[in-house]
Amino acid sequence: MYRIAVLPGDGIGPEVIEEGLKVLKAVEEKYGLRFDIKKYPFGGEAIDKYGEPYPEETRNGCLSSDAVLLGAVGGPKWDGLEGDKRPEAGLLALRKSLGVYANLRPAVLYPSLKDASPLKNELLEKGLDILVVRELTGGIYFGPRGKEAIGYGFRAYDTEVYETQEIERIAVIAFEAALRRRKKITSVDKANVLESSRLWRKTVEEVAKRYPEVELNHMYVDNCAMQLVKNPFQFDVILTNNMFGDILSDEAAQIVGSIGILPSASLRGDRVGLYEPIHGSAPDIAGKKIANPLATILSVAMMLQYSFGEEEAAQDIRKAVERALEEGFRTADLGKGIVLSTEEMGDKVVEYIKG
């Protein structure tokens, strides 16, 4: 039995989570799996109920589960709160308590959605499938920082710091992911300038020796940003640090044309993971039944693959999503086609899973 903590969260979170759970029920029945699913308050919902975004009840539930499935957090209702009391602070606390350090963000462009991409159609005939593996807990976002007054103003600094062990563990996750894909890794750094990047490159090369079947190449981050829009098909897995990954994963997401179909996973060394769509809580459309549930449904597929090792069930979900899109079914954010509500899109995916 697989234990799943579900955090519906705020805005459209509860709506898209319901469709994700509907898909879980379908694969549970089809593949004879068993899921122990428990919902917990989180984000703004938890603030309204408990006065904090990540209450002890939720924390204990997440820490005793095999995986966490999150909807979305935040909204203007809570914007006036202090930083550590806002819904988004709960997300940082959740990641820290779970000990996740690797963020995996697939950017998949289905041929049927190529008109939604800002790239030229002739670049997109083959579709697109990139996985960005970003280190989450080190680098310039977490290094020493400060601000001090000087004679004519201020001086501020942030420090990029990485240790061998931090680089090694994220590299292992990237190489393991590459084994399930096209067996190609592009490690992105700035080794021509930064000492931390030189350590990054050296460490990744050492890890690569354990994976002779995976092709490794290196690329400077500025060139990678250019190549993503010039020739995105050259990439399979992109491995990079915290700040570079923050930027490149958003760039890759925009190539796809809609964040409504993009899932993500945050992992640590074992099978425990946090799964969530990359879109926000979209309070402006909450309750209107037009939110796109596909990113959450595809996050469920990632959970089945990475936390539970249920590769066949995960692929079944992805194929059902692809079929729905190929047959012209859309939610409002995806443009022209047979426009479905949030619930109807979930039902369509379930229909194709059941066959």
Curated annotation (Swiss-Prot):
Protein family (similarity comment): Belongs to the isocitrate and isopropylmalate dehydrogenases family. LeuB type 1 subfamily.
Top EC category: oxidoreductase
Binding site for NAD(+): 75-88, 280-292
Pfam families, sorted: Iso_dh
Gene Ontology CC annotations of this record: cytosol
NAD listed as a keyword: yes
Cofactor annotation: Mg(2+); Mn(2+)
Organism this protein belongs to: Caldanaerobacter subterraneus subsp. tengcongensis (strain DSM 15242 / JCM 11007 / NBRC 100824 / MB4)
Domain of life: Bacteria
Site, Important for catalysis: residue positions: Y141, K190
Sequence positions that bind Mg(2+): D222, D246, D250
Binding residues annotated for substrate, in chain numbering: R95, R105, R134, D222
Alphabetical UniProt keywords: Amino-acid biosynthesis, Branched-chain amino acid biosynthesis, Cytoplasm, Leucine biosynthesis, Magnesium, Manganese, Metal-binding, NAD, Oxidoreductase
Subunit structure: Homodimer.
Gene name of the encoded protein: leuB
Subcellular location(s) per record: Cytoplasm
Pathway(s) per entry: Amino-acid biosynthesis; L-leucine biosynthesis; L-leucine from 3-methyl-2-oxobutanoate: step 3/4
A GO molecular-function annotation: 3-isopropylmalate dehydrogenase activity
InterPro entries in alphabetical order: IsoCit/isopropylmalate_DH_CS (IPR019818), IsoPropMal-DH-like_dom (IPR024084), Isopropylmalate_DH (IPR004429)
Lineage per the UniProt record: Bacteria, Bacillati, Bacillota, Clostridia, Thermoanaerobacterales
Protein name, per record: 3-isopropylmalate dehydrogenase
